[in-house]
Amino acid sequence: MNHIKKLYDWVLSWAASPYALTALFVLAFTESVFFPIPPDILLIAMAMGAVAKSFRFALICIIGSVSGAIVGYYIGNLAWLNSNGEFTGLANLFFNNIPGFTHELYNNIKILFDEWDFWIIFTAGFTPIPYKVFTITSGAFEMNTLMFIIASVISRGARFFLVAYLIWKFGPSIKNFIDKYFNWVALGFTACLIGGFVLIKYMI
């Protein structure tokens, strides 16, 4: 856990760097593929320091995150299984080094993807669920590429623009709320949204 804290602090240190915008893009990109620290923390720090640029920072986050998601998708699509249907060395590298990314989780996601692929990506992109797990598995399960990109743009856009809006609207005073409650609000909103669509589906 200590190494995660050090990584967290290292990411935050880029907020005051002349290369902060580049760091934000790279962080958002890599988090969609393998990096464990979400870009939100750097986005929040940068937006707090320049509130008027909050939406610009959010847009950079979105572009970086969706670009990384597409790379993750094609890693799953092209380099996840060999011709015999077995996991490649690259796949096992991810299983062995990304916390929480297990064979059991992979198999459970596979069952859900057949019916809920769009909503799975939306949920992973909008909530604190590890997005990288789903960008890769969506490619491995051959989710429709356009649908994957649309779900990623909508969910990542909603998440990062919402953070930017809260900071732009309320300023630094909103930071404690975002830190403590934003992920819970995101989870609750997503649960209600999906629940509503499920209810409509079974009523029609």
Predicted regions and their residues:
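Membrane-interfacial helix-loop-helix
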Residues: 1-26, 49-127, 152-204
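Residues that mark transmembrane-helix kinks and helix-interface sites
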Residues: 40, 132, 148, 160-164
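Transmembrane helix boundary and interhelical junction motifs in multipass membrane proteins
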Residues: 21, 30-46, 119, 126-137
